[in-house]
Regions:
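Alpha/beta-hydrolase fold nucleophile elbow
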Residues: 101-113
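Short beta-strand/loop motif that positions the catalytic acidic residue
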Residues: 150, 156-158
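A conserved short beta-strand
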Residues: 128-140
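Serine-hydrolase catalytic machinery in alpha/beta-hydrolase-like enzymes
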Residues: 5-102, 191-196, 200
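Active-site loop->helix "elbow" adjoining a glycine-rich segment at hydrolase catalytic centers
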Residues: 113-116, 138
Length: 234
């Protein structure tokens, strides 16, 4: 297993991250934290640990630089700038494709709260690199017009007792034209603090990623065999 503290370059700042890549990883999960959080989010770290046991690499990174963090703590001007956060994720997706341990691996964007909107925006920009988007208690509505342009599969995970966010996710699901699923975690509130709630999230997300990896493999197999079938039929 490779475990490193990394620095991810973007157009205007460098961002700190923690990259862990188990041996024979099948994909890498890039976490996008919510407003007021960071790469140290205990909930994201718990989910990341579970996903690594399923053979997925993880990158937890800050979406704001240190100076931006300090300013945002006073003004909250960056935390809802979904365009900015989306560009940061795009830069991270591109960076992962330059690293020897993650080059060529499919990328799963896992967003929480406002990070989910940023993940959807990034998925529109990198559909060939992003395998799927997973949203945990997310605000997909904040993705704006990008929501209708997402083409990769999307999983929306929402707590059953998080009524306002559940309603927003139900509306977002109606706007998605890509393959998608809305999964309600029974009795969970917005932060999934209830016993077993985050484990439920990690297990459901892991199964979803397994299925999407299988779909991608099937698609590649079909693409390789389709010309041969066409020649036989003619």
């Amino acid at each position: 297993m490779i475990s490193d503290m990394v620095v991810v370059p973007t157009a205007d700042v460098t961002l700190a991250g923690d990259l862990v890549v188990p041996a024979r990883s099948r994909a890498v999960v890039l976490f996008a934290h919510g407003s007021g959080s960071s790469r140290h989010s205990p909930r994201n770290r718990m989910v990341a640990a579970e996903l690594r046991t399923a053979g997925l690499g993880t990158l937890l990174m800050d979406l704001l630089g240190e100076r931006e963090e300090r300013r945002d703590a006073l003004t909250a001007e960056h935390r809802f700038d979904i365009g900015l956060l989306g560009r940061r994720l795009v830069a991270a997706v591109d960076w992962l494709d330059t690293q020897p341990d993650t080059r060529g691996l499919p990328v799963v964007l896992f967003g929480a709260s406002t990070g989910a909107a940023a993940a959807l925006v990034a998925a529109v920009e990198r559909p060939d690199r992003v395998l799927t988007v997973v949203s945990r208690g997310g605000r997909p509505d904040l993705a704006g017009d990008a929501l209708e342009r997402v083409t990769v599969p999307v999983l929306l995970l929402v707590g059953g007792r998080d009524q306002d966010v559940l309603a927003l996710n139900q509306e977002a699901a109606r706007r998605l034209s890509c393959p998608h699923a809305l999964h309600v975690v029974p009795q969970a509130t917005h932060l999934f603090e209830e016993p077993g709630a985050l484990e439920h999230v990690a297990e459901t997300a892991g199964r979803w990623c397994d299925d999407r990896l299988w779909d991608a493999q099937e698609s590649r197999t079909s693409a390789r065999t389709a010309p041969a079938r066409s020649r036989e039929e003619t």
